Amino acid sequence: MDLQRATALTRELFDAAIAAVDVRAAVARSIQFDGDTLFIPPAAFACRRSEIGRIVVIAVGKAAAAMAAEAETILGDALSAGFCLTKYGHGEATRAIPVREAAHPTPDAAGLAAAAELRALVTGLTEDDLVICLISGGGSALLTAPAAPIGLDELRATTGLLLAAGANINELNVVRKHLETLKGGGLARAAAPARVVALAISDVLGDPLDVIASGPCSGNTSSFADAWAVIARYGLEQQLPTTVIAQLQAGLRGTIPPLPRPDDPLFAHVSAAVIANLPRS
């Protein structure tokens, strides 16, 4: 079996395992609301509804629609707004949260438009507001927000080259988060100063929150040097689009700031937890 087929088979097994997780039950265990107090035990969050401004639910990933549907059922009229982004064919009916679909694993224009819609939703929230971010496998490819001047075509080409070379999900996400603006803590930054609680269903062995869906609400533990090392490992230095090379090289030189680390003050208003994963499924 060649490496590309082995990688594809591994992803199929991961997808099957994630599908076997009782997504709604995982969310129901993790978000509890009695009409007065909101409890989110995995993230050690508890607050009276009267102490929260807007409650916004965001769900991104292949399990996003089921997660969003359960969250809106739990919250009822306490839900102020929401947004769901999932893979084509994975959507389902929700009461109040709009559902968008986009391509996976190679990003497309629908993912780009959805990312802009999501950013607009969380921009302007206050410190009294709460964002509940529900993350699942596939979120990295779906949430497409390339850093200028990188365009969608360049991002698609880079993803295609890495996949064809046999890069694993960890390697792919290290590169992605250094080329985009909502990964590597970028979503938490966009939502600031609102409080953020991120709940993830993991498709990554070891459950690293900064790797699952490229860590949109998590501090980053990788660097531009790590991203470039992935490119070099697969001999892609001369094949990548010039805008991608320029972005990574600028990061190596320090002319682009590094992604925020876990101890960055940005994450003082963020809590996160894995609520289901492959071993427990």
Regions from the language model: what does each represent?
Residues 1-281:
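N-terminal loops that bind phosphate or other acidic moieties
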